[in-house]
């Protein structure tokens, strides 16, 4: 009797683990698709030529540790992805009617970012059962917040000029590419529990 119960419990655990893994892979696949769309839409929001704006370049000091997608635990990676997307969304939501940018492209871009955040929050809920290094995750998200604050300060110091936004758009392109790489890494890992 004990052996039969043990066998049934093991089958249930195995089935739920497989379902969990499939759901994660589906969410990650959707995340990568939406991220590709965000990159395309961001490139449509160009107002000034990049060459014209080169003298206005700035190094926003994206934390180098945050740029290496191969060194994270799952929870850390999810925390970084969430914070980056949340900051990008907040940055662009505040300027939905910037001169020279088509409002429809901006709205599409924001919708895509919002979708990414929803997919990511679903992933984070699925991973919430696992223990994580919250102190390290908090430190990394704080670094990302400081990075985006430097971007906001730059825009303010440049009076939100067209060139400043072009420089920021290029920088955000880097961020979205990083998000794409990190999501790909998580997909390859399978994010198995």
From Swiss-Prot:
UniProt keyword list: Antiviral defense, Cytokine, Disulfide bond, Glycoprotein, Secreted, Signal
Subcellular location: Secreted
Pfam families given in the database record: Interferon
Disulfide-linked positions: 53-163
Signal peptide: 1-21
GO biological process: adaptive immune response; B cell activation involved in immune response; defense response to bacterium; defense response to virus; humoral immune response; natural killer cell activation involved in immune response; response to exogenous dsRNA; T cell activation involved in immune response
One term under GO cellular component: extracellular space
A GO MF label: type I interferon receptor binding
Keyword set includes Glycosyltransferase: no
Gene3D superfamilies membership: 1.20.1250.10
Entry-linked InterPro entries: 4_helix_cytokine-like_core, Interferon_alpha/beta/delta
Positions glycosylated per UniProt: 139
Purpose of the protein: Type I interferon required for maintaining basal levels of IFN-regulated genes, including 2'-5'-oligoadenylate synthetase, IRF7 and ISG15, in the female reproductive tract. Directly mediates protection against viral and bacterial genital infections.
Similarity section: Belongs to the alpha/beta interferon family.
Name this polypeptide is given: Interferon epsilon
Protein source organism: Sus scrofa
């Amino acid at each position: 009797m004990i052996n039969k119960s043990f066998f049934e419990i093991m089958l249930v655990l195995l089935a739920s683990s497989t379902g969990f893994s499939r759901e994660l892979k589906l969410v990650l696949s959707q995340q990568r698709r939406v991220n590709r769309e965000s990159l395309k839409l961001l490139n449509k929001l160009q107002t000034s030529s990049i060459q014209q704006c080169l003298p206005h370049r700035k190094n926003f000091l994206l934390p180098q540790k945050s740029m290496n997608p191969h060194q994270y635990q799952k929870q850390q990676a999810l925390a970084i992805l969430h914070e980056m997307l949340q900051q990008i969304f907040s940055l662009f939501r505040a300027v939905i009617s910037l001169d020279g940018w088509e409002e429809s492209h901006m709205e599409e871009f924001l919708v895509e970012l919002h979708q990414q955040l929803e997919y990511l929050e679903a992933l984070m809920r699925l991973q919430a059962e696992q223990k994580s290094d919250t102190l390290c995750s908090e430190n990394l998200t704080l670094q990302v917040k400081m990075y985006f604050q430097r971007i906001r300060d730059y825009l303010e110091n440049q009076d939100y000029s067209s060139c400043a936004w072009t420089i920021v758009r290029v920088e955000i392109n880097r961020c979205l590419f990083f998000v794409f790489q990190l999501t790909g890494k998580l997909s390859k890992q399978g994010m198995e529990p």
